[in-house]
Structures are given as structure tokens and as C-alpha cells.
Curated annotation (Swiss-Prot):
Belongs to the dUTPase family. The lineage of its organism: Bacteria, Bacillati, Bacillota, Bacilli, Lactobacillales. One of its GO terms (biological process) is dUTP catabolic process. This is Deoxyuridine 5'-triphosphate nucleotidohydrolase. This enzyme is involved in nucleotide metabolism: it produces dUMP, the immediate precursor of thymidine nucleotides and it decreases the intracellular concentration of dUTP so that uracil cannot be incorporated into DNA. SUPFAM superfamilies: dUTPase-like.
């Protein structure tokens, strides 16, 4: 039985996508790479595809954190601060659960992220819910990136 991990989405099956791994024995985060080379104009915000989807158990979430070197070395920041990948994002009908990294170039120069370059770290975590949550009506996820917001 699979508990938690990463899989390559169908579109990138033959694209040489690496399954994320932890760099050291005590690393919390799994290094997630860019699935394609992406160029950013100064000030531009773009989605970088990972070619990956993540599966996990109920009560778990995958947080995607910016690598600490991105602002200093690349002039890029994860624009939403922390990416949140919910369990029901996996295999959603809109995009198969394909995860993207939303980055912004805050420099005055073009910045390029190369295919295979590590961009974010994914950390699986349990989460808690508030009292009365079980009594609140929930929607079923039907879309991909940004689909649960207005």
C-alpha cells in the first residue's frame, strides 16, 4: 500500500523527471525540480511545472517551501510564500494533480530556471481541523491549480 510520495504525471512520463528526494539524512524537505526550462522577464510571475503529483493519507498535506538560496542566488521568490498541496489534489480531473511552483523574478534582469534545477522543497505534514469542522458542508474538488478559491 502506498502511504505518501510522488509520481510523474502522464504528460511528463518520458521527460526524464526525477522523483524528489531528501538531500541528507536529517533533511525535512524533498527537493523538487523544474520539469522544463523557464525564463522570467524582470518582475514577471510564472508557473514552473514540476511534472509531478503527490499522494498522501487523509489528515496530511504537502507544503512546498522556497529554497533559501533562490532569492539571493536567482532573484526568484515563491510568490505565494508556501504552496499547499491537498490530498484531494492528487489525480484531480482538471490536471491529474500536476504541481506547479509560482515564482516571481524580483530583479531587473532575465532569470532562467533550467530543467532539472531544484526550486522548492516539499514537506509532508499532518494537519489539524477546528472544532465543528465535521459539521460543515464540504465541496468536492473538481479542478486543479487554484480551484478551491474564488
Amino acid at each position: 500500500m502506498k502511504i505518501r510520495g510522488f509520481e510523474v504525471v502522464t504528460k511528463y512520463k518520458n521527460a526524464g523527471i526525477n522523483i524528489p528526494k531528501r538531500s541528507t539524512e536529517h533533511s525535512a524537505g524533498y527537493d523538487i525540480e523544474a520539469a522544463e526550462t523557464v525564463s522570467f522577464a524582470p518582475g514577471e510571475i510564472k508557473l514552473i511545472p514540476t511534472g509531478l503529483k503527490a499522494y498522501m493519507q487523509a489528515g496530511e498535506v504537502l507544503y512546498m517551501y522556497d529554497r533559501s538560496s533562490n532569492p539571493r542566488k536567482k532573484g526568484l521568490v515563491l510568490i505565494n510564500s508556501v504552496g499547499v498541496i491537498d490530498k484531494d489534489y492528487y489525480n484531480n480531473p482538471d490536471n491529474e494533480g500536476h504541481m506547479f511552483m509560482q515564482m516571481r523574478n524580483f530583479t531587473d534582469e532575465e532569470v532562467v530556471i533550467e530543467k532539472g534545477e531544484r526550486v522548492v522543497q516539499g514537506v509532508f505534514m499532518p494537519f489539524l481541523v477546528a472544532d465543528g469542522d465535521e459539521n460543515q458542508e464540504k465541496e468536492e474538488r473538481t479542478g486543479g491549480f487554484g480551484s478551491t478559491g474564488a
